């Protein structure tokens, strides 16, 4: 690619992104006026008010989020991310991501944290009606009609997790909120560990500040999907770490990855598409003849099949769940949502969640190793999109892919020009804070 084409590509991507978002907002408002069953309220995003979800408001926690963003900007300007040890980069990113997302949610007070966990459509509301764990798994497909919309749209795994928490005395809404907070931090750390294993220390340091202020953090803190994202991220990290290890160690990394990805399949059906990311890493490892690749595959496949087999023995076959959820999906709002709009609207919602720095990064990223992660996630997202299984609500549904795409923004950050990192963080944080102030999200 010639130099002028390289300069033109990010500009073209930004223009296309702006056009997609603008069209989706304008067309979405028209769609909402003529289709009262669209149930979005802030198309292409979802608002808590299904008529008009755009509610400008101010919370003092947004000032806190702004101050945290300024701290990250200052750290970029002073070169802090490049000087400190890796453990401090991981810790700062993990804690920063949790704090930034929490401060955004707190702009609506405690309700901003609780609503996504205790709403009647969410998982927690189903504990009272769900039978004991064994019976719940065994009858899940046959009795799927009795549960709320989010349980009907997912495998039974997260309800089982809530049942376990309830059994050990961690009942109620706040343990669920804590899971989302923890999932946000774990995701950031796992993604950085993967980037380090795949592309090296410098790319990890470049990506770190962007994971703190990513706009998709708005939805990480207020939905169970934060747990799904964390489990998937840990699985990818286990694969990445195992590939370069000796066979004796690699097989155990593979087992860990298999357990994590096997579990992910029973938390969200999209876990199957996320497998494209570790699959690309494994193919690259085989081509490079990395010593641990075959052991990771063997351990991962064995452990993953063991998890699937355990659920099958308990009475739940994954493919039956997929079919039941597909039927439920088209009995709900999906039947009233026009694909002609969501073909673009879904992409627009994803662009909003990822932020403009990610879009620019996709245009300038040249590292082949980074593209293993970014490209795998983009392919997984595209597969989900073209399945027509997601029409709207993708700012939450596609959270499982967003961190792996967001790291493309690291390509705009240069160690030699510290203002690049400061500017990138400032832009992403501003987008997140303004969006939180304008949108009263359902999650």
Q: Which residues does each PLM region occupy?
A:
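Specific aromatic-rich, kink-prone transmembrane helix
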Residues: 190, 228-246, 257, 405-408
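Hydrophobic, aromatic-rich transmembrane alpha-helices
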Residues: 70-74, 349-374, 378-385
């Amino acid at each position: 690619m010639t130099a002028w084409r390289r300069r033109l590509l990010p500009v073209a991507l930004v223009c296309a992104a702006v056009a997609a978002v603008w069209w989706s907002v304008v067309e979405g408002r028209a769609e909402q006026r003529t289709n009262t069953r669209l149930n979005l309220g802030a198309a292409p995003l979802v608002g808590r008010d299904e008529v008009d979800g755009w509610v400008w408001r101010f919370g003092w926690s947004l000032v806190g989020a702004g101050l945290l963003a300024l701290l990250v900007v200052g750290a970029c300007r002073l070169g802090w991310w490049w000087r400190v040890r890796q453990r401090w980069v991981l810790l700062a990113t993990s804690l920063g991501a949790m704090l930034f997302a929490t401060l955004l949610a707190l702009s609506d007070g405690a309700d901003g944290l609780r609503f996504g966990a205790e709403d009647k459509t969410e998982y927690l509301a189903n504990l009272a009606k769900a039978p004991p764990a064994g019976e719940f798994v065994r009858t899940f497909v046959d009795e799927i009609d009795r549960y709320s919309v989010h349980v009907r749209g997912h495998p039974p795994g997260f309800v089982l997790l809530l049942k376990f928490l309830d059994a050990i005395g961690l009942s109620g809404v706040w343990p669920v909120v804590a899971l989302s907070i923890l999932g946000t931090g774990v995701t950031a750390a796992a993604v950085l560990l993967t980037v380090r294993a795949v592309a090296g220390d410098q790319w990890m340091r470049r990506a770190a500040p962007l994971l703190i202020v990513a706009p998709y953090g708005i939805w990480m803190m207020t939905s169970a999907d934060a747990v799904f994202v964390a489990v998937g991220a840990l699985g990818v990290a286990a694969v990445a770490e195992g590939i370069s290890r000796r066979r004796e160690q690699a097989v155990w990394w593979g087992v860990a990855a298999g357990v994590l990805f096997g579990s992910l399949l029973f938390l969200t059906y999209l876990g199957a598409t996320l497998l494209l990311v570790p699959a690309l890493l494994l193919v690259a490892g085989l081509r490079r003849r990395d010593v641990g690749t075959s052991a990771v595959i063997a351990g991962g496949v064995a452990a993953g099949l063991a998890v699937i087999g355990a659920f099958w023995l308990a009475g739940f076959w994954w493919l039956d769940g997929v079919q039941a959820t597909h039927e439920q999906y088209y009995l709900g709002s999906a039947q009233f949502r026009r694909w002609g709009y969501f073909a673009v609207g879904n992409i627009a919602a994803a662009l909003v969640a990822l932020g403009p720095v990610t879009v620019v990064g996709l245009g300038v990223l040249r590292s082949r190793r980074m593209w293993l992660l970014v490209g795998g996630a983009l392919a997984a997202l595209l597969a989900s999109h073209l399945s027509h299984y997601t029409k709207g609500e993708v700012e939450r549904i596609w959270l499982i892919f967003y961190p792996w795409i967001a790291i493309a923004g690291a390509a705009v950050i240069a160690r030699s020009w510290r203002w690049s990192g400061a500017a990138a963080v400032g832009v992403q944080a501003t987008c997140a804070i303004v969006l939180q102030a304008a949108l009263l999200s359902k999650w």
